[in-house]
Amino acid sequence: VFGSSGADALVVNRGSQIFAEGTAAEPIVFTSRANVEGTSTAESIGQWGGLVILGRAPIGTCSAGGTTPGTAGCQAAVEGVTNAYYGGGLANDNSGRIKYFQIRYSGFALSAGNELNGITLAGVGRGTTFEYVQVHNSSDDGIEWFGGTVNGKYIVLTGNDDDSIDTDNGYTGVNQFVIVTHRATAGAAGGDYVWEAGTGDGSVNETVRQDTHFANVTAVANGGAAILLRGGGDYQLTNSVIAGAASSTCLDIDGAATIQAAGAGTDENGPPVFKSVFFACSAPYVDDTNVTAA
């Protein structure tokens, strides 16, 4: 499957499903026309939109005021697509099966703050299978989760130009066996964060609080901080190695709510947890006024 221009994207709406199951020897590939024609290079990014999957699983921020997050009436408009909504109250919602699947040269900014990622998982439920997936050379995030409960395994993110992993709007899930190498070639903008986590509306009071666990991650950052955790969510990283360039730091935690004690807010499980994690950066963390080393 290929797209011809930046705005081309495949959108799987709520109530629909995608079944894209390749094999290790013959993965399913979504790419750009230029790649099919043989004109893409190692620097190519943003040659088509990407894959957007919309589900009915709980999210943390609703478009309509007065609607309770996590209920059937809570929905939000997804970035990059007109009149497309996600969210609901079905944690076990099933948007299909994706296995042995690769996205190449995708991602497109329609306007500031309105971008298509390599893969967008918005309100996708844990009934969905998401395994053996690679996103290569996206001009925006590799994969962005907007709420939802879908879990993933065997994820490879290479050469992406913004965040490789971006989780927000009350995403609750576990992802295991992840490899990340940031974009770092001559003339490229370079990747942003290996993992950026936050909230859907910038607040720290989402009543469907983000609770995200990554395990068995090997990541090589390009520069800056490798991981940015903020927004008062609950985060855990286990059995992982995070390495960075000479100028990079491994961890930046912002906001007092992000390190508050368990029980201090709705669904609050406490500060970020790191178990058996090896940090190999020029500095282990950013010691700033948001959250200090103390």
Features from the language model and the residues they span:
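Extracellular beta-rich repeat passengers
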Residues: 3-15, 22-23, 27-162, 166-294
